[in-house]
Amino acid sequence: MILRGMEDSKSAQKRFEAAVKVIRSLPEDGSYDLSDDMLVLFYSYYKQATEGPCNTLKPNSWDPIGKAKWEAWKDLGNMSKDQAMTEYVQEIQLIIETLPVTDRMAELLDALDPFYEIVEDDDDDDDEGVSKAAPLFTGSTNADKDAERDEEVESESKEGNLDDYMELVEKQKDLSSTTGEKGSLLVFNRSEENSISSLTDGTHSSLNTVDDEEELVYDGSDDEMDSDSMDKPATPEKGSGVRSVRLADGSVVGANMQHGGNREPQCGSQDGKPQGLISPVPHPPTLGTVRNDRISACSGRERGCQGDGGQRGETADRMDKQAINTQITTILSELEDNMQDVLRRLTTLEQLTASQAEISPSKTWHSDKPKKRLSWWPLNSSPFTAVLTVLWPFAVHWLVQFYLQRRRRR
């Protein structure tokens, strides 16, 4: 038991050392880049496996990376070194499939030989020379084989259904071409339609585009035959009731009154054969006249049916246009009245302004009376100005002297 425990610890240490070498050998700009959380987790397991429980001081707050590493290491508590090594190897096993195979990876795979093997990829060896490590599962190979076998059987059944469907499509096209030459309507087989719908329901989603194209072909053929049926007469059904009118010359006009549908009444022959609007009679001139009359009568009924709705629509449109024209006329008349009122007010204002200008006297800033001038005074200035000019120096001198005397007395 002791020897087995030592062997287990040695194998765990060997795997741990190989895993550490793989992590350290990863390139910084490689195809797979470890996240920060994964790096912190590997760091905590590595420190726990190499140094034991965390007993160091907590880093400063300005070192968030060191703080995260310390907290992850501290959270492991008293985990043993062997358990930390095992956890480290288990974490790297989760991402080993995404790592490139190198020499360090080969050492790790040798240590994990009971669980993994190297699978060489021939296509990648020519370009990169690097292969991936894939896990071996004993039960997965049988499941893959069963899945592949089921896919092959399903694909074969789908191909067979598609072939049957294409044959039905070709038959339908041939049938439509032959019936079109004979001038009769295309009768769609309901059983074939059901079989085609069942086949399309069972096919794979990748065949949807083919089914859509074939459905468009059927829709196009149906539309063509519907348009032909409007121009050509339909075959009269048994028991539908055929009214015949015998003319004076012996010709017969048949009107097929069909019930239970949305189609217009069709003209048919008396003998029930699809031979046009009128059955052939031995009088060609009269036949042509009757055919033209019948066609004109049918077209007249259609125009009459369409004309009722058209006249109603035209009457409603005409009434709407008349109402709009009436509103526009009313608005224009009101606008004209408002403009005339504004012009009338402007004319009155101009007249009032002109009358006020005529009544008010004009103001002048100049005095009407001229200044009186002394005849005996020779100067242009007044005598008072001249006396003041002569006496003001004496007055100033006297004031200065008086001020000085008062100052001396003090």
Swiss-Prot record:
Keyword set, alphabetical order: Coiled coil, Lipid-binding, Membrane, Transmembrane, Transmembrane helix, Transport
Bias kind Acidic residues: ranges: 119-128
Domain named ACB: residues: 12-101
InterPro entries named among the record's database cross-references: Acyl-CoA-binding_prot_CS (IPR022408), Acyl-CoA-binding_protein (IPR000582), Acyl-CoA-binding_sf (IPR035984), FERM/acyl-CoA-bd_prot_sf (IPR014352)
GO molecular function, one term: fatty-acyl-CoA binding
Annotated PROSITE patterns: ACB_1 (PS00880), ACB_2 (PS51228)
Annotated localization: Membrane
UniProt name for this protein: Acyl-CoA-binding domain-containing protein 5-B
Binding site for an acyl-CoA: 23-32, 43-47, 69, 88
Domain of life: Eukaryota
GO CC terms of this entry: cytoplasm; membrane; peroxisome
Span list, region Disordered: 119-165, 221-242, 254-320
Annotated function: Binds medium- and long-chain acyl-CoA esters.
Membrane-spanning intervals of the chain: 382-404
GO BP terms in the entry: fatty acid metabolic process
Coiled coil: 326-355
